[in-house]
């Protein structure tokens, strides 16, 4: 019997009762996964405890601010925080949100959640009030952790005035790494004032471990639900494919609120007893310094990270002899970048996945260079991949269609979004990614484009619809459409085509940026180019012909007639 994913379709049971989430599994597939050892009873907390006991004095995590925890010290800090959470009434299944950059404290909070069966909800540091209020209410978070200071702002203070809009939120904690907490509880004081957890909390592998919010075509972020078994299956397959062991040192420059950072930068290392190296603000100089200092053996990130590192290495050589490989995902690897890495002796590997199915296609370390440059890998252990047409019928090798996957890593659905879940997951457990790809005879896939309407800017997903909805609130704008435009470093940037209301005849990019700033949305969602036109091209049924606008922006870029934000 070939393993398949959990049964998730229109008849999936997803309900909230007293803030608890109930998941229903297809018992036949669940049994198959358990029989093959892909799923089990153990939770992430069980794996953590096993590692912490086996190597208490080994360094578990460090960050660029000089913080460093052994497995024993990290376990103690997390246990003290978990004890406080229990005292404040947190129960198994409650959602705990934390909006932290790449700091050791992220891991402390995550592990504290695991110890008491709470559900981790990591959030992007770039989010502002609009996204935060939406997500915290959506997942009904009971606690929220944020820095007292980061990037010259006080993130924890953003949420304090909004508590009247967050009825479920009971505690706000300031992570006082860079500045003292003045208006909230402080994480350091909580850990200092509490003793280690003495009560053993049992969590089953089928219970919810995390909700990761991801942007998509529907506008506002969707909560991707992952069980302990989903995450364990994903990361064990990931580590096995890349021969990762306790001797490896993981460099993670990506945000920990992303699946990339959360799963591969924090979770995977502790499953195998490796070291995690975190960077809160990516600059190529800071990244290279950590790579050298920590003797990092592997690094994972989007193409812009590689692009920037190569530019610095041209002028400033660095000792990267310990680096076994750089794993690149999120967007296509330009041939120029791949060739430069090869010339410098950096093994650049491709990986493909999504928050919903992460990561399920990876190359082999001993694959020929052509595989690295021209494919995005093949299915990880226990995962199936197929390419389908618009009717979701399987296509033969070589044909372009939508990529679909199923396996023990595939998510359990979107949090409190049964209709979106039913569209993404069919009754046989297949997740339809919305990405276009081709598969060769050997099972290797190559992502060729997207069906879904998103812009991938340096690995960050931007919903065109969300940006359009904000643009349409501008007093000068009558109609708007947002499309992706190519960018050598980031892969894509967003370009807004707007039709103005009479009697307005002009609209500057500065005006649009100021408007988005007042709307308190994340900066990476701001339009970076703007084109004012008389009307948007539409079909006879009224649908905007975005392909014409994409062609137009390509033409405009070559002629350099588009206003660009610096």
From Swiss-Prot:
GO MF entries: ATP binding; medium-chain fatty acid-CoA ligase activity
Reaction catalysis annotation: hexanoate + ATP + CoA = hexanoyl-CoA + AMP + diphosphate; octanoate + ATP + CoA = octanoyl-CoA + AMP + diphosphate; dodecanoate + ATP + CoA = dodecanoyl-CoA + AMP + diphosphate
GO cellular-component term (any): plasma membrane
Known pathway: Lipid metabolism; fatty acid beta-oxidation
Classification via InterPro entries: AMP-bd_C, AMP-bd_C_sf, AMP-binding_CS, AMP-dep_synth/lig_dom, ANL_N_sf
Annotated compartments: Cell membrane
Predominant localisation class: membrane
Record field: pH dependence: Optimum pH is 7.7-8.2.
Pfam families: AMP-binding, AMP-binding_C
SUPFAM superfamilies recorded: Acetyl-CoA synthetase-like
UniProt keywords, alphabetically: ATP-binding, Cell membrane, Fatty acid metabolism, Ligase, Lipid metabolism, Magnesium, Membrane, Nucleotide-binding
GO BP annotations listed: fatty acid beta-oxidation; fatty acid oxidation
Cofactor: Mg(2+)
Record has Magnesium as a keyword: yes
Domain of life: Bacteria
Alphabetical list of PROSITE patterns matching this protein: AMP_BINDING
Gene3D superfamilies reported in the protein's UniProt record: 3.30.300.30, N-terminal domain of ligase-like
Induction (free text): Expression independent of FadR. FadK is not expressed under aerobic growth conditions, the levels of anaerobic expression vary with the terminal electron acceptor, with more expression during growth on fumarate than on nitrate (at protein level).
Membrane topology value: Peripheral membrane protein
NCBIfam families linked to this entry: PRK06087.1
Assembly notes: Homodimer.
Job description of the protein: Catalyzes the esterification, concomitant with transport, of exogenous fatty acids into metabolically active CoA thioesters for subsequent degradation or incorporation into phospholipids. Is maximally active on C6:0, C8:0 and C12:0 fatty acids, while has a low activity on C14-C18 chain length fatty acids. Is involved in the anaerobic beta-oxidative degradation of fatty acids, which allows anaerobic growth of E.coli on fatty acids as a sole carbon and energy source in the presence of nitrate or fumarate as a terminal electron acceptor. Can functionally replace FadD under anaerobic conditions.
Full protein name: Medium-chain fatty-acid--CoA ligase
The organism of origin for this protein: Escherichia coli (strain K12)
Lineage: Bacteria, Pseudomonadati, Pseudomonadota, Gammaproteobacteria, Enterobacterales
């Amino acid at each position: 019997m070939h393993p398949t994913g959990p049964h998730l379709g229109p008849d999936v049971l997803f309900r909230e009762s007293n803030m608890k989430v109930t998941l229903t599994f297809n018992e036949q597939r669940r049994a198959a996964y358990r029989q093959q050892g892909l799923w089990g009873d153990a939770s992430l907390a069980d794996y953590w405890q096993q590692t912490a006991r086996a190597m208490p004095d080994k360094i578990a995590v460090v960050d660029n601010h000089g913080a460093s925890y052994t497995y024993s010290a990290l376990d103690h800090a997390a246990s003290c925080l978990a004890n406080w959470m229990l005292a404040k009434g947190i129960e198994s299944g409650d959602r705990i949100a934390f909006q932290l950059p790449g700091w050791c404290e992220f891991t402390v909070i995550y592990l504290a959640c695991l110890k008491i069966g709470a559900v981790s909800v990591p959030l992007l540091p770039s989010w502002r009030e609009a996204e935060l209020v939406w997500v915290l209410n959506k997942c009904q978070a009971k606690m929220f952790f944020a820095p007292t200071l980061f990037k010259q702002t006080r993130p924890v203070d953003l949420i304090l005035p909004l508590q009247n809009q967050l009825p479920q939120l009971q505690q706000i904690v300031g992570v006082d790494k860079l500045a003292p907490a003045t208006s909230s509880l402080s994480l350091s004081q909580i850990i200092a004032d509490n003793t280690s957890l003495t009560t053993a909390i049992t969590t089953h592998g089928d219970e919810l471990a995390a909700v990761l919010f991801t942007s998509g075509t529907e506008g506002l972020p969707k909560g991707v639900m992952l069980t302990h078994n989903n995450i364990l299956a994903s990361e064990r397959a990931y580590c096995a494919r890349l021969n990762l062991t306790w001797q490896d040192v993981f460099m993670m420059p990506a945000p920990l609120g992303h699946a990339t950072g959360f799963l591969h930068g924090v979770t995977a290392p502790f499953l195998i007893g490796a070291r995690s190296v975190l960077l809160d603000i990516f600059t190529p100089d800071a990244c290279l310094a950590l790579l050298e200092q920590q003797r990092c053996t592997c690094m994972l990130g989007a193409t812009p990270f590689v692009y920037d590192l190569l530019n610095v290495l041209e002028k400033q050589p660095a000792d990267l002899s310990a680096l076994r490989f750089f794993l690149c995902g999120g967007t296509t690897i330009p041939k120029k970048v791949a060739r430069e890495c090869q010339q410098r002796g950096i093994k650049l590997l491709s990986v493909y996945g999504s928050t919903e199915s992460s990561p399920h296609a990876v190359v082999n370390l001993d694959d020929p260079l052509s595989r690295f440059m021209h494919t995005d890998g093949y299915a990880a252990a226990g995962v199936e991949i197929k390419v389908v047409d618009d009717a979701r019928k399987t296509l033969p090798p070589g044909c372009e269609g939508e990529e679909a996957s199923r396996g023990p890593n595939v998510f359990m659905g979107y949090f409190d979004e049964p209709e979106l879940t039913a569209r993404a997951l069919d009754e046989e457990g297949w997740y339809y990614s919305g990405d276009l790809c081709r598969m060769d005879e050997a099972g290797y896939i190559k992502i060729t484009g997207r069906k879904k309407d998103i812009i991938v800017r340096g690995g960050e997903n931007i919903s065109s619809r969300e940006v359009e909805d904000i643009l349409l609130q501008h007093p000068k704008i009558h109609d708007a459409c947002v499309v992706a435009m190519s960018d050598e470093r980031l892969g894509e940037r967003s370009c807004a085509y707007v039709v103005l209301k009479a009697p307005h005849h002009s609209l500057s990019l500065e005006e649009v940026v100021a408007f988005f700033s007042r709307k308190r949305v994340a900066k990476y969602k701001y339009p970076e180019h703007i084109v004012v036109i008389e009307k948007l091209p539409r079909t006879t049924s009224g649908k905007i012909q975005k392909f014409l606008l994409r062609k137009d922006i390509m033409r405009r870029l070559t002629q350099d007639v588009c206003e660009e934000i610096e």
